[in-house]
Amino acid sequence: MTSTPFRIHAPFEPTGDQPQAIQKLVAGVQAGHRFQTLLGATGTGKTHTIARVIEALGRPTLVLAHNKTLAAQLCNELRSFFPENAVEYFISYYDYYQPEAYIPVTDTYIEKSASINEEIDMLRHSATRSLFERRDVIVVASISCIYGLGIPAEYLKAAIPLEVGRETELRQLLRQLATIQYTRNDVELGRGRFRVRGDVLEIGPAYEDRIIRVEFFGDEIEAIRYVDPLTGETLQSVERLNIYPAKHFVTPAERLEAACVAIEAELQAQVANLEAQNKLLEAQRLSQRTRYDLEMLRQVGYCNGVENYSRHLAGRAAGEPPECLIDYFPENWLLVVDESHVTVPQIRGMYNGDQARKKVLIDHGFRLPSAADNRPLKPEEFWQKVQQCIFVSATPGDWELAVSTQVVEQIIRPTGVVDPEIFVRPTQGQVDDLYGEIRLRCDRQERVLVTTLTKRMAEDLTEYFQERGVRVRYLHSEINAIERIEILEALRQGDFDVLIGVNLLREGLDLPEVSLVAILDADKEGFLRAERSLIQTIGRAARHVRGQAILYADTLTESMQKAIQETERRRAIQLAYNQAHGIIPQPIVKKTSNAILAFLDVSRRLNAESVPVLSSQTLQDLSLEDIPPLIQDLEAKMKAAAQELAFEEAARYRDQIKRLRDRLVGHP
C-alpha cells in the first residue's frame, strides 16, 4: 500500500475563522476525540476547512452526503483541492430500482426490477481498489454505502497478482479471470471482459476505463501495459499490478456448496413452520422458489435475487451485520458527515424501512427468514464501526451536539459578509409592508425570497404582486426538480425579482443576489417554523452585503427567539471581527452556470443531428452524477452510426465519450 501525503492545491489560504477551526479539529482528532462538530455558518468555507483537516491528518477519509447531487458537488470540490490524491465517488449504481415487494390486500407480487449504470459501477470499484492500494484516499459517498458490499478479505484474496518476469501459464490465468467473474469476449472488449490474441491478453478491468495488456513470451509475462481503449496507444508500462474481481460479491466454490447446504436446512425448517401455521400455499410457494434458486446456484453460481441469500454465502450468523464500504477502509480512518442534521436521521431510517418490506415477503412465503439479513446497517452497528467522526452543519442536530466532545464554530466569512439583520413586524398589513420592501430591492436590482405556510397563499400572493407590476414567480411541490433549478437560475440572472414558496430550505439554494428574506406567519409553530428551519431560511440572505430578514408575526415564539438570538450572536461576532481587522464586506461573485443545466444543454445538443462538441467549460460545469447517462446516450448514437457505416461520425462520438470518461474518473 502506497502512502503519498495529501497535498492541497488552492489559490487561497485559510482566512477568518478557518485557521482556528482547522487547528482545533486537528488537535481534537489527534487527542482521540471520537465525535466533533464543525458548526459553520452558511458561506464560511466549511469544505475548505475539512480539506485542510484531511491534509494535516493524512488519514483515509469517508465523506458522507445525504444525496447524490451533494455528493457530486463535494467530490468536484475535493478533486480540485487534491488533484494528486485519490478522491473517489461512491453512490448507488441504480439508474432505476423497484425492490421486490408483496401487497397482501390485492394479492399483488412485484418482482425486483433494476437498471445498473455501468459508469457508476466502475467508480464504485475504483473506490474499493484505491482503498486497498493507497492511504491518500477520500471517498465521497451517499447513504448507500451502509448496504452490504461483499467481504473485503475475500475480494482481496481473489485478486490476481501479475508481475513482469513471473512464470504464469496463460490457460491457468484465463481460468482465474473466469473465476473472478470476468467473461471472455474476443470481439468487443469492455469492463469485466477479456480477450486473447496470440500471446497477448487484454483485460477490461471493472475499476477503470483503461485496458490492461499483458504480453507473454512462452509462459513468462514479458510486459504489462495500460493502453487507451480507443486508440490502442500505450499510456503506461508497469512492473506489477493486481486484477481485482469484476463484482464485489465473490464466493469461493467451497463456500458456495456450504451455503447451499445451509439454505436447504433453513428451507426445511421454515416450510415446517409455515405448515404448522396451516399456511400451505405459502409453504408450497417458498419450497418451489427456493429449490429453483438452489439449482441455479449449484449449476451457474448465480440466481435472480441472489442477494437474499447473502447471509449464507458470506458465512455470517443470523443477525450479524453485513460488510459494507466502511469495512474496506484501512485502520485509523476518519468519517466526515456533511449536513449532519439531515444525514444522521437518514442513517437511522434506512434499516426500519427495509425490514418492514422484507417481513411481508417472509410471512407470505416469498423469501426465507435469512433474507432479512440482506439489509443496511442498523444505526448502532454503523456507529460501532466508526472510529472518529466530524459532523459538519450550519444547524447540527441535538444528537450530534450531545455526543460531540468538542463543538468548533466557524462564523467569520472570508468575504467579510455578516449574517442578515432581522426585523419582526406585525402580520396586520404585512402584504403592503412587504410590497414596499420589494420595491426598494427592485430599484437596487436585488432579489427577494418570500416563504409562506401554504401553497394557496403562495399562489394568491404571486397573483397580487403580479397585478401590481412586480416580476414574481413561485415554487411549489408540483414543479419538478429540473424546472425548479431553471427557476432559481432565472432568479439569479434577473429574469424576475421575487420568488415565493412554501419550503425554500432545500439544499442548493445558494443565491448571492438575494438581499431580503421575508417569512410570513413566522409565529406558527411547526417544522417550517422550527428553530433550525428559521436559521436555515434566514441564512438564505447571508451571502449579500445588505442581507436582511423580516419575520411577520404577532407573538414571539420560542423558536423565533432562539433563531434571532443565534443569528444576532453570530452577527455581533462578525461585525467585531471586521472592525478589529479593518475588513470591508465584499459581495460574493459567483458564476450563474449550473451543473444540471449544463447537463440539460448537452442533452439537447445530443438530440440534434450533428455530433456535439463539448467545450472544456461545458465539461467543467457538468455534475459527476449527470455524466453517466450522457455517456450511455453517446454510446448508443456511436453504435448506430457505426452500423450505418458512418465511421467518421462514430469516431467523433467516441472522442466525446473519452473526454466525458476522463472527467468522470478525475483526469484533467
Curated annotation (Swiss-Prot):
GO terms for biological process: nucleotide-excision repair; SOS response. One of its GO terms (molecular function) is DNA binding. SUPFAM superfamilies: C-terminal UvrC-binding domain of UvrB (SSF46600), P-loop containing nucleoside triphosphate hydrolases (SSF52540). The keyword DNA damage applies. It is found in: Cytoplasm. Residues 430-596 form the Helicase C-terminal domain. This is UvrABC system protein B. It comes from Thermosynechococcus vestitus (strain NIES-2133 / IAM M-273 / BP-1).
